[in-house]
Amino acid sequence: MTVAAPAKVEYEAVIGLEVHCQLSTRSKIFSSSATAFGAPPNTQIDPVCMGLPGTLPVLNEKVLEYAVKAGLALNCTIAPYSKFDRKQYFYPDLPKNYQISQYDLPIATHGWVEIQLSDGRSKRIGITRLHIEEDAGKLVHAGSDRLSGSSYSLVDFNRAGVPLIEIVSEPDIRTGEEAAEYVQELRRILRYAGLCDGNLQEGSLRCDVNISVRPLGSPTFGTKVEIKNMNSFNAIQRAIEYEFNRQVKAVEAGEPIVQETRLWEENSQRTISMRKKEGSSDYRYFPEPDLPPIRVTEAQKARWQAELPELPSVKRRRYQQVYGLSVYDSRYLSDERNTAEYFEAVVAAGADPKAAANWMMSDIASYLNTHKLDYPDIALKPETLAELIGLIEQGTISSKIAKEILPELLEKGGSARALVEAKGLTQISDSSLLEPMIAEVLAENPEQLQQYREGKTKLFGYFVGQLMKKTQGRADPKLANELLKRHLDG
């Protein structure tokens, strides 16, 4: 009697993200201290953010504006009434021993973001809530990158009181790729709107991952584990992939999954246990008594909605539908607001959209990457790039000549046409000028000419090269090919 081996169970990840974004206000959420990154430790502090007795918080109006704009950009419902709460916990970088946040009545709820995946699929990720809170300070550990193993720790309170929004997703994410793309799309949207600079390395955008595993198709959630300390999009993806495999192995071995917070170690490419995961009851939330409720009017919403720019997802669709660009090109050009604005200015100046895209994604992108520059930093104006593209289309210069003069235009600016004329680079499109040069090329290469006429037609490229050399690259390629073909076959 034989018994069939049980089918191997397939598992899926259930992932939700909590993304903390520092708002790009010049002053803190409840006080007037500056928020600039990189200032000397404890030079951007005041009695309010230090929690000194007798101080009272006052909400920075810009924080409310930016939070509502973020909610609108993320397709959320804006609450007409919300409030602040105290989140109670003790940690050395939290001077008041509580954090002012929002608990049961956040500023925005029920939003969504659509992401594009590498296989061409799109997926909508739900947003549960978006709430406002203050950031904590920062611990600097001597001799280690975390508390464990350090000889002592210092506290920098510059970050305490910096305004944050926390964006909590629905558990709609299934893979590390989806998670990384979701965070990138959030970053694009917030940067476009001028609400957050999205710098993961500086901590202005931080992501915590909540992940559990379950058999594929099961409606039941597994035990959730939180992962922290990921400072790049790749790290988010790798941490999720590692943790998924770790949890699956534990489940298959019959080991329990502990609800805990784990730390992603970049050097060892693994997660390690950090602490037991707290529940919301551990924080003993209660309404903040020193701040009034927040009220957002329909007029405020309408005004802030009107001030939002066209967002990247809308640009991508428009570039494909109006300009006929590919999905890849549309995504590249809309990824950063500076890039998109430059591209649109080039097209507005009369350039063919596909030609403009090709130049920006190849030669100009290479120059920017090499010199670590962005479009506002270069001397090449959009109108000049459009002029350069026009010179190629008119047959005034070849693409080769355009590539040769591009670095000078990028560094010094000026008129493309004037530079071409000053350097004598105008394309030779007159057959009466090219014919004598072709005759010279053939006369100078009798051996190759004989081989060509005996059937070695691959030498045609050699003759094209010799003609281009003689004309210093100025011969009209199409005309040169036609004339050479006629002379060689004649």
UniProtKB/Swiss-Prot annotation:
* SUPFAM superfamilies (UniProt xref): GatB/YqeY motif (SSF89095), Glutamine synthetase/guanido kinase (SSF55931)
Which enzyme type, at the first EC level? ligase
Could you say which EC number(s) this protein's record lists? Answer: 6.3.5.-
- Domain of life, per UniProt, equals Bacteria
Q: Which PROSITE patterns match?
A: GATB
Tagged with keyword Translocase: no
Q: Which PANTHER family does this chain map to?
A: GLUTAMYL-TRNA GLN AMIDOTRANSFERASE SUBUNIT B MITOCHONDRIAL AND PROKARYOTIC PET112-RELATED, GLUTAMYL-TRNA(GLN) AMIDOTRANSFERASE SUBUNIT B, MITOCHONDRIAL
Q: What HAMAP family does UniProt report for this protein, alphabetically?
A: GatB (MF_00121)
Task: Please identify the protein, giving its name as recorded.
Answer: Aspartyl/glutamyl-tRNA(Asn/Gln) amidotransferase subunit B
